[in-house]
Amino acid sequence: MKLACLGLLAALLSWPQVQPLQKAVALSATQIYISPDAHSTRMGQVRPGEVIGVQDHSGAFTQVFSGVSGWITGHDFVALDAPGADEVIFGAAAALEAEAQSDSSDTQTAQDAARLYLNLYGYLPQSPRAGEALYRGASIQWQLKMAEEPRRRTPEERIFPDDSLMRKVINKFKDTPWAARAEYQLLVEHFTCGDWFSKPDCIGKEVGRYQDYVKKYPRGPMSAQAAYDAVYREGIAWTIYSQPGKLQNQGKTDEYARKVADDSARLLQDYPHTDWAARGALVAFQVAHHSPLKLPGSTPLGGP
């Protein structure tokens, strides 16, 4: 009996040990084949950013697991533990993001870019790229969902998609350019007061939101634009209140003329040599010369 047990133990020790799968991230869309042969049955497809398990190699083929076990050609993936993996993943995401931006209808490529960014953050959170990757992935997803929302007749009816990832950027990466960018994008969630042309008081509320943002992020990457957004709205309010009709109000006209002059001067002082400072100066010039600003066809959702 003792000899039998020793024999069984020796057999178990000599049995090939199952190696854990090496985790990797796909960098491009790749077909999965049932065998290491490009003419064999296709089992599915791996999308950029998907995490795969590398099992084995056979010539130019790699056996992977991604929901199903199969074979892919080439080396369009990077192991998560490879040196510089974060830079490679970020580079692939940035390339796809640029491609998607050149064709706004290409939502699949944009989703692939977002997946790469978000998995970089999720699997390599200590990377110097992690904060930016989380922001860029979250921003792409939020913008895609925003584009899917039906157009609302009035600002009061606006509905916004889930912003939890954007909020995660703001909370986890405080005082970074990525938090500043995320918070600027989410300012529009506050713009549900009403239509500018029936409720011009709502313009003042939007001005306040932009000015509060600039106070919070005085040197942020979006601060000059936010300061201009406020001046532009002040110019629009001046235009609406100065025109003949039921909304004409000389007191409000004078008030907004002063605000445009003061805030455009501050914009020029705080953010010199920027397009936003120059555009603010143009608004101030138009108001000073009693030249109404061109009114938009409808109340915009953020921005100038």
Which positions does each model-derived feature cover?
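Sec-dependent N-terminal signal peptides
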Residues: L3-L13
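Cleaved targeting-peptide boundary
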Residues: S14-A24
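Boundary regions of SH3-family modules and the immediately adjacent low-complexity/disordered segments
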Residues: P20, P36, T41-G44, V51-G53, ...
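Extracytoplasmic
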Residues: L27-A29, R47, G59-F61, G67, ...
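Short, structured beta-strand/loop micro-motifs enriched in basic residues and often containing a Trp
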Residues: S28-D37
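Short solvent-exposed coil/turn linkers within tandem alpha-helical repeat scaffolds
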Residues: H39-S40, T107, L120-E132, K168-E183, ...
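Amphipathic alpha-helical repeat scaffolds of TPR domains
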Residues: G84-S102, P128-P150, D175-G194, P221-P244, ...
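Short coil/linker segments at helix-helix boundaries
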Residues: E99-Q111, Q143-K168, F191-R209, I236-L268
